[in-house]
């Protein structure tokens, strides 16, 4: 009979893999998955900082590959904040599809790239609201704040014209590598 510990290990999602100085995040943007990402990211960051202290002319870089259909807005913002504050240069790379809340992780990179055949999807938030009328009004106020936050983020980090951004937010349109470079969502093709 397998032990309880082995059952728990089998259930672990492992959406984040570390290979050398590369982190592969392939999964949903959720509290659990982003916690796993942050744990592995911080461990690699510390390891690379120690290595840079020992080696002359060594400039550490973390490459974060992101393939995700999106998920929780707050978890995506959390990952972006951690990446932005890294003491090691971070290159974020959109792979496959980098959608919705996953684009926040992408935006956190000191340098942003995209795979030749990858796509980015930026769109308005979606939520479910139920409750008493005043609770619904409060939720609507919060959603408006979040939408402003998303717009401010992309207006400050990209060169998407405001009218184009407003159109993108109303539809689910995937942007290819060429469009992502044009609007400075990313800096280069990886």
Regions found by a protein language model. Name each.
Residues 1-190:
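Terminal-region recognition feature
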